Amino acid sequence: METLLVLTNLPDLASAKVMAAQLIERRLAACVNVLSPCQSVYRWQGKVEQAVEIPLAIKTTRPRYAEVESAIRELHPDEVPEIIAIPVTAGLPAYLQWIEQECAAPSEC
């Protein structure tokens, strides 16, 4: 099964913690790293914007990706949230297996 690293950013620590907890509770992710705040600079609707954001690094599997994306869209306050999925091409086999087990649909447990 393919492991994915999904990246998103939240506007504050409180919303980042809520999203991380929801993804774990719903078994959509095995682990969510709530990272240190970062400064983002981007163009939005023709204007250069700057914002302090809280990055999330979400470990999941390809079969759960659509549900992860849906949950992020549901819980994220932005109109167009960053949602980027990066395939994991290598890793400690035991860790990748753990991700697969934790993200298994309840009927597969």
What residue ranges belong to the model's regions?
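Positively charged, small/polar-rich N-terminal and surface patches that mediate targeting and assembly
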Residues: 1-109
